[in-house]
Amino acid sequence: MIKMFHYGHPWRTFKWLIGLTPKFTDLKENGEYGEWLGRKFLKNKGFSILYLNWRSRKDRRYEIDLICMDNEILVFVEIRARSVNSFTTGFQTIGKRKRRALLKSFKAYLSENSHLPLNYRFDVIEVDLPSNCNGKVKLFHHENIAIFKDTLH
């Protein structure tokens, strides 16, 4: 069962399910579409989705896009949707401030939940969105990314 804290407008999801793509001009819709595509991609790879847009009970600013299980491994996923015309990749947009926020979010999740698996990792999914509705979306899955100087323990 997926626990969803916030996930956009249901009509948008329905449109995407029947094959209609966004206009790629609305940044919020682009982000939601990117998260939807990322989630769909991981499900097709056999991941179990535990949480969408998880937020800490203690501090609502701490947010994780997806929390999944890949067999026995707990996976924290950051999804970065960008225009294919961007000068930087989605992975490159995870700057110092975002890394600090992600680290705090992961630590909050680990401290607020018991019965955690022994192994966990951090993945990034880049979603390159076309500049128009006729273009193709490209997804890149970066597994087990080491973006923290500190450990999560």
Identify the residue ranges that each predicted region occupies.
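Acidic-basic catalytic patches of nuclease active cores, encompassing PD-(D/E)XK
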Residues: 1-53
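Domain-level recognition of nuclease-like catalytic cores that cleave nucleotide substrates
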Residues: 2-5, 111-153
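Short amphipathic alpha-helical face segments that pack within enzyme cores
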Residues: 37, 55, 101-104
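Conserved catalytic cores of phosphodiester-cleaving nucleases, focusing on short active-site segments
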Residues: 42, 64-85, 102
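Active-site metal-binding core of divalent-cation-utilizing nuclease and nuclease-like domains
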Residues: 48-74
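Hydrophobic/aromatic beta-strand patches that form the interior of the parallel beta-sheet core
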Residues: 50, 77, 123-125
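Generic beta-structure capping elements
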Residues: 52, 79-82, 144-145
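Catalytic cores of nucleic-acid endonucleases
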Residues: 81-131
